[in-house]
Structure formats: C-alpha cells, structure tokens
Amino acid sequence: MKKSTATPAPLPVPLWRQQLHYRLKEGALIAVGALCLYLWMALLTYDTSDPGFSHTSNVDQVQNAAGRAGAYFADILFMVLGYFAYIFPLLLAVKTWQIFRERHQPWDWSGWLFSWRLIGLVFLVLSGAALAHIHFHPPASLPFSAGGALGESLGDLARNLLNVQGSTLMFIALFLFGLTVFTDLSWFKVMDLTGKITLDLFELVQGAATRWWEARNERKRLEAQLREDEPVFKAAPMAAEKREPAKPSLRERILKREEPPAQPVEPREPTLAREPIVPPRETAPEALAPRETVVPRQQHAAPTIVPPSAASRAPEPSKRAMKEKQAPLFVDSAVEGTLPSISILDPAEQKKIEYSPESLAGVGQLLEIKLKEFGVEVAVDSIHPGPVITRYEIQPAAGVKVSRIANLAKDLARSLAVTSVRVVEVIPGKTTVGIEIPNENRQMVRFSEVLATPQYDEQKSPVTLALGHDIGGKPVITDLAKMPHLLVAGTTGSGKSVGVNAMILSILFKSSPEDARLIMIDPKMLELSIYEGIPHLLCPVVTDMKDAANALRWSVAEMERRYKLMAAMGVRNLAGFNRKIKDAQEAGEVIHDPLYRRESMDDEPPALKTLPTIVVVVDEFADMMMIVGKKVEELIARIAQKARAAGIHLILATQRPSVDVITGLIKANIPTRMAFQVSSKIDSRTIIDQGGAEQLLGHGDMLYMPPGTSLPIRVHGAFVSDDEVHRTVEAWKLRGAPDYNDDILNGVEEAGSGFDGGGGGGEGDDAETDALYDEAVQFVLESRRASISAVQRKLKIGYNRAARMIESMEMAGVVTPMNSNGSREVIAPGGPRD
C-alpha cells in the first residue's frame, strides 16, 4: 500500500472571526476616509492668520473650516511638504480603498511587504516635495517654500549636484518608483489600458461618422427616388392606351433573353427571391403597371440573393474582436484569468464572388428542364446562393408529390454534372421544395470569422459552440447547455474530428477554468492528446478505455453529489447554485457545505464555491463500447438522463454509425445530433432518423438537428487547422497549469483493474490497492449481505469507495450482479476469505 504524502489541510477559520475581519476592514475604510476628508478640508481652508506651529497668532475666531486642530494639522503639512500636502490625503485614501477591495481575502500579515509599502510612500513624498520646490515658486500663503522643509532641503542639495534637469529626472524616477511600490501599480497595464481606451474612442467616433454618412446617403437616395417617381404618378390619369409600357430593366432583359412564349401552363422564369407566385403577366395596358411590379420586387429580392458587392464584405466584427485588434505591448500580457485573443487564429480570406444573377438563373432554367424530362412540372421560385451550396426553391405543379422529386436526387446530380444533390422536402413556413446544388468553387469557412461575430460574443453560456455557417453564410452559434448532450457521427474524412476540435476551441475561447472543465477520452491517442496540459482538464487525456469507464463512473458520482448539494441549497440547476454562491460572496457571507460530515465537534464545514460546467468529450465511443461493454452504455444513459441540471454534458463522436454503437437507449436520451457525410441512407437514418447525410459533400458539411425539432439544418463547419489548436493550447498553458482530480483515474485500480471487456479477476489488485478490501469481503461473507450501505456503515467509509468494493467483489465472483430490484446475492461460501 502506498503511503499518502498529502499535506494536512489548514484548519478552517471560524465563521465569527471571518465576519469580524470583514467588519473591521469596513470600519477602517470609513474611519480613514473620514480622516482624509477632514485633512483635505483643513488644507483647502488654510489661512495664515490662524494659529499654527510656524507662526503665532492671537485671534479668537479661527477661519479654518476644520477648526483649531485642523489649522494646526494644515500648518504642519504645508510646513513639511508644501504643495504636496494636497496629494498626501489622496494617497492614503487610495491605499485604503485597495485594502478594502480585498476584504474577502484572508488576512495575511507580511512584515516584508509592509516595509516595502512604507519605503514606497517615503520615496513618493520626498520626491514629490522636491519636485514642487524646484519647479514652483512659493506663494505668500505657505509657511515655507513650495516643497516645504523636506522639499527645500532635498531640492537645493540635488540642484547643486545635478543641476535642474538632472534633479528633475532623478526625482521623477523616484516618484514613479515610489508610486509603483506603494500602490502596486503596473505601468505596463496602464499603457495597455490607455491603448484600449484610445481604440474604443476611435471606434466610437468612427462608428458615429459611418452611421451619419450612411444615413445621409440613404436620405439622398430616397429623395432621388421620389423625384424620379413623381412624374410617373402625375401622368397616371392620362390615356393609358396611347402610352407604351415602361422599358424593362437590364436585369429583366437578361433573365427574359431565352424565355419561351408565355403559355398559361408553362413554368415562369425564376425571379430571384421574390414574393409568392403570381399569375404570368400578359400585357400591361396601364401605364403604371411596369413600375408597380418591377420596383417593389427588386427591393424585396435584395435581402435574399446577395449581390457580389454585398457578399464580398466581411461580416461586422464583434466588440471583442475589435478590442483584440490592438496587439499586446508585451509578451507577458497573457495573465491568469484572461481569455486568449481571437487574433491568434488564422484570419479569414477575402471571399471572391464566383457567380452572377445570370448564371444562377441559367442553372434554374436547366433544373426546370431536367425535371420536366423526368415528368415533373416545377417552377423555380427563388435562389439562395451560399459559400458552399446554392439552394433553389421550386414550386411543384398541382398534383406533384414531393417524394417523386426526392427520388430523383441521384438522377439530377448526374444530369447537372455535380457531386450530389440534396432535396429538402419541407422548408418551414414555405410551400416550396428546396434543391441544394454544390457550388463550382467552394469557399472555406474559417473558425476565426465565426468567433469574431457578435452572435458568439453576446452568448453568456460558458459552453457556447461555434459550428460554422449555414447555407446563406450566416454564423451558426448554439449552446451546449440547452442541448444538453450532443451525438456526432460521420465517416472517415467527413470533417468530424475538425468539428469536435472547433467545439472544444469554442469553449476555450469563451470560458475560464473556473467556468468550464473538460474530461477528454481519446481512444485513437492522436485527436485529443494535443490538449494535454491545458488548465481546463479535470484529468489527463484518457487513452486507456479501462480509465475511460472509471471517468464516466466518476461523472455519475459527481452528478449525484451535485444533485444532493442543490437539493440541500434549495436551487433547481447549476446556474441557480452559482448565482446563490456569488450573491453570498458579494454580501461578505460564507455558505458552508451542508453535506459535510464532521468527524469531531471542532470541525468546521468547508465553504462552498461556484461549480464549473463539466463537458465529457469522447472522440470514438464505438471503440470504448467494444472494449468496456454494455456498462458504458448504461453510464452514458444515466448521465444523459439526469446530468443537465447538474451542469455535466456529453459530446459523443463516432465514425461507425451503426445500430450496435448508436443504440436506441443512447438515441432516446440524446435528441441533439450532428451528422457528417455517411456512406448510406441507413447510416443517415441511424443518426438523424431520416436520409440526407449520404448526400453531403464532406470536409465539414453537416446536418445539425437542434433540440426540440426534427428538421435538420445544413451547416458548413468551420475549419480549424492543427497550428491553430497548438497556438490555443500554448496560450492557455501560459495562463496556468492544470489542477487534476486524482480520484477520476485512481479509482480504476480500486474498482477493477482487470477489466478486460467483460470479465477477468481484479481481486488481487484490489486487495493490494485498498487496505479495507479484505475486511469488506469478510464482512459480506459472514453477514451474507452484499449491500453498499452496509459495507459503508461497517467500515465507516464513503459511498463511492464502498460501491467500488462491491463491484470488485462482483468481478471476482463473490457476489452476483445487481438484480432487477437492486439487490445482490452472496454466492461465495461462508467463512473468512483466504
């Protein structure tokens, strides 16, 4: 048995002493603040006619607002420090406020630190008084020079030795040194803060100017449009039969260049992103008809089909991205408690427009022709181009079933000479059918452009996930806490591992280790091992599946512990628990652990702290289920059923989406799924309960099924390179070391180190690692009771330790597995254990 080398924990401070400590600091702040105000009032109302140490006066009426004592105090300060006497009370007030701001920290007296602070104050006062004497003339109202007696003696001595310029330089250096030591001021932080404030002011002025300029241009455009439309409306009462219809625009002439003669049953030419279908226009007898149909339709089409000028513009960056544009002045700016800058990621490329409205209209015409060849009458209603695919929304003719169009997906892909075509049978809120055709030149979605959006910056959840862009190029941001678990599946090369890395980096760029912690299980030993050493990890990256089973078992135990803690606190979820703890800390109160069991009357329960959200990431849980067996499926089901309110979430990824891996038990408890490209429609139905994933393009193209809906959303996943992951990991390593919980993996040896897929005896190892295992077996054999609570009461140990002992006995053949009613039977013969 290994000897424990843990140092004994310090005795907790009694609650009454903590409360007294807080109140004394508050009282000291009030007293020193009142003293500083009194001194300042005395200095501001100083009068030479009042009595003082530097002169004599016999007046009966004191002019000083602070009274006779204030007159003496002001005279002493002016006599010693001169003009610097005005600064002295301010220094005391600033230092007192700094001490009060740390009132919740335990009091730790350090004589060495107090000496340094006193030395800093002395240097600050002496150098300030000397500078005042050198550069200011003494007025008649002061008893001595502008720097007082101290400033006069030091200033004259330094001026004789170093001249005025040398003396000024020396005293400025001493003043800054004293200010830094006394107030603990970092000039590097001051420079960084000054730069950020300057940048914010510049952005504010620039934004105001941009908004004014855009409003001015919009006003001019509206005025020009009104002037253009005014003659038309005035001429409307004229005889319409004598006027020619208005000349169509260049865009309409291009779209109608190859249009066949209008027939009542023929499909209409697609008008890009227009309103619902209207009957074909035969003639325009009224003079006003062309303007009433063309102009509003062009205005409505602009938000749907993105013109090249609008698509080339980058999305508006978030406030965080704008602030982080300023490069850090010093390498050591990565301090603990800050988040890495988004600028360490690769910037997004300038996207070029590879299409035109004419080319999109041509593809729409070809789509109508090909469907007509297969006996399906449709009309293209609107076109929605995106970075990777373009969606053509078609309106089927009366009597055409959507299933006929869906069955023609492969035939359309062959006819259009593209990789694949996906048919969207139902578009929420529309009567059209979507046909998604890949673009000839695919654009890459960079991870940095998704993180730099205001949608990601405005999310408050510590487990916010940035997935990528939808088919229209808009960012897709979701919250893992609302899922609350995620199932990811896709074949090799579909972008599944890159998608998992993007989710992990989304958490790392959003949360500190106090807000979110990670447990990573990597059977491949390559995908997640790169994150080894970041402070968010609760344990080292798990690569052994025996350790993985114990990590899940610890997660279940932690879930149960949090539920008991929240029930004792009277809250319903982790957010309410953390809010209650923070409110108590701000009020200067301490909430003790209600579940703490005292071993003696002198024991004080520890103070509660906020609990972080825990995310368990499994890169390939198919391999884990093959090695460990059905036990892992039960643990995953328990976590998925109950862990949402406890703040524990699962991200399960696999490249083998078969029914023996993604079982019905797992699917029933994890409704949020994400399907990358798969090889068959059966695999697609296994993941998202419908087809479509087999028609994806790969390389990050996915179907994301949000919680609470059965309609998947097509998302183009953001690309994360290995260099970006390395830079992010190194940035977090500079901010702190990981604080591992040894109970997560050490329990594997106690719970059954001979876990070989489904059997194996771990009895010898358990007896060697746990000194009480033999006593537990002897108690079970003698009492014939295989109860965890009985072993816990008999040996006076914790519940988790007793449960591991019972599980070890089950593996060794001492007791039977748990029956349907939760009980076990002792099958080994009675008597002491050999």
UniProtKB/Swiss-Prot annotation:
GO terms for biological process: cell division; chromosome segregation. Homohexamer. Forms a ring that surrounds DNA. Residues 238-318 are annotated as: Disordered. GO terms for cellular component: plasma membrane. Pfam families: FtsK_4TM (PF13491), FtsK_alpha (PF17854), FtsK_gamma (PF09397), FtsK_SpoIIIE (PF01580). Essential cell division protein that coordinates cell division and chromosome segregation. The N-terminus is involved in assembly of the cell-division machinery. The C-terminus functions as a DNA motor that moves dsDNA in an ATP-dependent manner towards the dif recombination site, which is located within the replication terminus region. Translocation stops specifically at Xer-dif sites, where FtsK interacts with the Xer recombinase, allowing activation of chromosome unlinking by recombination. FtsK orienting polar sequences (KOPS) guide the direction of DNA translocation. It is found in: Cell inner membrane. The chain crosses the membrane at residues 26-46, 73-93, 118-138, 168-188. The keyword Magnesium does not apply. Coiled coil: none annotated. ATP binds at residues 493-498. Residues 189-834 are cytoplasmic. It is a multi-pass membrane protein. It comes from Pseudomonas putida (strain ATCC 47054 / DSM 6125 / CFBP 8728 / NCIMB 11950 / KT2440). Gene3D superfamilies: 3.30.980.40, P-loop containing nucleotide triphosphate hydrolases, Winged helix-like DNA-binding domain superfamily/Winged helix DNA-binding domain. Residues 240-272 have a biased composition (Basic and acidic residues). It comes from the Bacteria. Residues 473-685 form the FtsK domain. Consists of an N-terminal domain, which is sufficient for the localization to the septal ring and is required for cell division, followed by a linker domain, and a C-terminal domain, which forms the translocation motor involved in chromosome segregation. The C-terminal domain can be further subdivided into alpha, beta and gamma subdomains. The alpha and beta subdomains multimerise to produce a hexameric ring, contain the nucleotide binding motif and form the DNA pump. This is DNA translocase FtsK. Belongs to the FtsK/SpoIIIE/SftA family. The keyword Nucleotide-binding applies. Keywords: ATP-binding, Cell cycle, Cell division, Cell inner membrane, Cell membrane, Chromosome partition, DNA-binding, Membrane, Nucleotide-binding, Transmembrane, Transmembrane helix.
